[in-house]
């Protein structure tokens, strides 16, 4: 895993720009809440929204924003969807935060659904394939409840995950709106502090929990404190890999790794390919 000294390095200044005094947390929250309320109204989603609650940072922030935008009682449904690799503490953290927000919430164990699917699928020992199946089962359960309750599905991916493709296509990437799509992971954490998300969730390592001991940063191979300044330079500032590396004082190979993730995952951010109009 890449480990960099942020105490005096150039990228620390970029990170500070993203999450420090230049990041107006109150204004950002108000803007996103206005977006949520307006989108739900325009869609005539009488039931409000349904959010998948993982017990992690992103879903906690999205749930809090939705509760503030729509009012907690009845218009926000939080679904906690544990699988075989979901720690009990995640379920408990998600439920406790939902109660704190005053939103309706339910816990549905999706493992029987995943297991039934595996019984009729080829017996292949591939944890990523099974993990992606798990994510897509969660999406299906969210949309089931959305349809029944006349709700929209509020996605919980952030700009870091979307940019590098760290989500399952038609799984956790499937949503009607993604309130924090414009915020990098480090910014979401700062917004979480403003929204008074519990400390246990704020400090928890990001993980989709698709298999045992699964954490995002271990799978990616670097921290979001490293990824976000690089993405800012590549995506927002439109710098080349060489320019970004020079500006941040990081190895060019590290920048190119992030750049490669962005390029390789472009299909995840696009509509399905179709032939030219005949």
Kindly give the residue locations of the regions a language model identified.
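A non-catalytic, amphipathic alpha-helix used as a structural packing/dimerization or gating element
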Residues: 27, 31-35, 183-194, 236, ...
């Amino acid at each position: 895993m890449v480990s960099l000294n942020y105490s005096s390095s150039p990228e620390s200044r970029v990170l500070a720009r993203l999450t420090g005094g230049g990041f107006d947390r109150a204004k950002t929250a108000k803007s996103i809440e206005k977006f949520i309320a307006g989108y739900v109204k325009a869609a005539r989603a009488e039931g409000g929204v349904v959010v998948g609650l993982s017990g992690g940072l992103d879903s906690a922030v999205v749930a809090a924003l939705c509760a503030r935008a729509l009012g907690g009682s009845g218009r926000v449904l939080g679904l906690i969807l544990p699988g075989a690799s979901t720690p009990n503490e995640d379920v408990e953290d998600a439920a406790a935060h939902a109660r704190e927000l005053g939103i309706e919430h339910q816990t549905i164990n999706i493992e029987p659904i995943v297991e039934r699917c595996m019984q009729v699928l080829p017996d292949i020992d591939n944890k990523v394939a099974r993990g992606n199946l798990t994510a897509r089962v969660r999406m299906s359960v969210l949309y089931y409840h959305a349809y029944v309750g006349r709700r929209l599905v509020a996605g919980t991916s952030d700009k870091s995950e979307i940019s590098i493709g760290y989500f399952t296509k038609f799984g956790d990437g499937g949503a009607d709106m993604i309130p924090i799509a414009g915020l990098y992971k480090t910014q979401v954490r700062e917004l979480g502090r403003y929204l008074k998300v519990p400390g246990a969730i704020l400090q928890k390592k990001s993980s989709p929990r698709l298999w045992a001991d699964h954490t995002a940063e271990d799978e990616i191979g670097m921290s979001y404190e490293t990824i976000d300044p690089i993405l800012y330079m590549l995506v927002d500032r439109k710098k080349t890999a060489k320019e970004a590396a020079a500006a941040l004082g990081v190895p060019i190979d590290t920048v190119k790794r992030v750049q490669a993730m962005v390029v390789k995952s472009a299909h995840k951010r696009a509509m399905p390919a179709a032939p030219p109009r005949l």
